[in-house]
């Protein structure tokens, strides 16, 4: 009996130490609390990679830059933390991207 209890305690401790990789939905105060906890009160806006003006056309040199951006689809659609963690589940690792 003691061995089973001891094994259960160690198993629970191992699960708690390994972290939770299961995605969860975080909204409102819960999102702010989790972000504060994960980032140790030092969170900021997630940055997108810099795209230099010479790469503006994305290899679509025959198009005007504005039209190339429209066809790209991904550019200009930066997702904020609410889109990533409130509208759909996210993991703690995704929250770390905002630290």
Swiss-Prot record:
InterPro entries: Bombyxin (IPR017097), Insulin-like (IPR016179), Insulin-like_sf (IPR036438), Insulin_CS (IPR022353), Insulin_family (IPR022352). Disulfide bonds join 27-86, 39-99, 85-90. PROSITE patterns: INSULIN. Keywords: Cleavage on pair of basic residues, Disulfide bond, Hormone, Secreted, Signal. SMART domains: IlGF. CDD domains: IlGF_insulin_bombyxin_like. It comes from the Eukaryota. It is found in: Secreted. Residues 48-76 form a propeptide. One of its GO terms (molecular function) is growth factor activity. Its main location: secreted. Residues 1-19 form the signal peptide. Gene3D superfamilies: Insulin-like. Brain peptide responsible for activation of prothoracic glands to produce ecdysone in insects. Heterodimer of a B chain and an A chain linked by two disulfide bonds. PANTHER family: INSULIN-LIKE PEPTIDE 1-RELATED (PTHR13647:SF4), INSULIN-LIKE PEPTIDE 2-RELATED (PTHR13647). Belongs to the insulin family. This is Bombyxin A-1 homolog. It comes from Samia cynthia. The lineage of its organism: Eukaryota, Metazoa, Ecdysozoa, Arthropoda, Hexapoda.
